[in-house]
């Protein structure tokens, strides 16, 4: 009994795959349509964003003569997480807003800032994203300056070195056009396939001789040909 059921499932899956193959041009059309929508969205709807990055290097205040050991490096990496919180603190953000005369709240500025710590180092990268490339550079440097001042005040660290000042981005960092087009293509192909599969599963029409035998539980004696096709 289970063998018969498994055979029926295999036949149904095979028939379903055949139906999908017959609809391959429709699936491709929908996928291309969604990919085109992703391209249109990336080019004409989303505002391009530019990212400027600056990096600082922080010395552990408890390190004598600025000598660095493996233990100091590990401790410094943990302290870097504290510095990350300081950089994104409200005091730092408000100072940047005041110095740059920004007309939006600190919460909005925070969304533009990304702080990352290079693994097993004391190097902290501060990136700022903005629709204006010059503004992204200006904000990155302003955040760095305000953050350095705050870190010194809170941790009593005096040795903070600027490794890189904020660069002037020449190309937008987002949107990622290729990624959006690819996502659109995959989503379009996936959605159209799912819809066709559901339609195939719900389709209980009798289309073949085998369907008639299953529906009536009788053996077919023959097929009456369509005279119009002879």
Curated annotation (Swiss-Prot):
Sorted UniProt keywords: Capsule biogenesis/degradation, Cell membrane, Exopolysaccharide synthesis, Membrane, Transmembrane, Transmembrane helix
Alphabetical GO biological process terms: capsule polysaccharide biosynthetic process
Protein location: Cell membrane
Membrane protein topology class: Multi-pass membrane protein
Residues annotated as transmembrane: 25-45, 181-201
InterPro entries: Bact_polysacc_biosynth/exp, LPS_length_determ_N_term
Keyword flag Membrane: yes
One Pfam match: Wzz
Pathway: Capsule biogenesis; capsule polysaccharide biosynthesis
Gene Ontology cellular component terms for the protein in this record: plasma membrane
Keyword Cell membrane: yes
GO molecular function annotation: protein tyrosine kinase activity
Role noted for this protein: Required for CpsD phosphorylation. Involved in the regulation of capsular polysaccharide biosynthesis. May be part of a complex that directs the coordinated polymerization and export to the cell surface of the capsular polysaccharide.
Protein name: Capsular polysaccharide biosynthesis protein CpsC
Organism: Streptococcus agalactiae serotype Ia (strain ATCC 27591 / A909 / CDC SS700)
């Amino acid at each position: 009994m289970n063998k018969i059921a498994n055979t029926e499932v295999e036949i149904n899956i095979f028939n379903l795959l055949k139906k999908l193959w017959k609809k391959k041009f429709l699936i491709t059309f929908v996928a291309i349509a969604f990919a085109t929508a992703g391209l249109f969205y990336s080019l004409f709807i989303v505002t391009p964003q530019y990212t400027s990055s600056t990096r600082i290097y922080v010395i552990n205040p408890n390190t004598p003569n600025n000598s660095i050991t493996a233990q100091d490096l590990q401790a410094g990496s943990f302290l870097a997480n504290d510095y990350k919180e300081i950089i994104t603190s409200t005091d730092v953000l408000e100072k940047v807003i005041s110095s740059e005369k920004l007309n939006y709240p600190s919460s909005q500025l925070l969304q533009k800032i990304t702080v990352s710590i290079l693994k097993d180092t004391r190097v902290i990268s501060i990136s700022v994203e903005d629709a204006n490339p010059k503004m992204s550079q200006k904000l990155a440097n302003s955040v760095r300056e305000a953050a350095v001042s705050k870190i010194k005040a809170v941790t009593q660290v005096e040795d903070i070195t600027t490794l890189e000042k904020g660069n002037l981005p020449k190309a937008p960092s987002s949107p990622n056009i290729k990624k959006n087009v690819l996502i659109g293509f995959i989503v379009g192909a996936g959605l159209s396939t799912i819809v066709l599969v559901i339609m195939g599963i719900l389709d209980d029409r009798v289309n073949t001789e085998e369907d008639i035998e299953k529906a009536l539980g009788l053996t077919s004696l023959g097929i009456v040909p369509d005279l119009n096709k002879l």
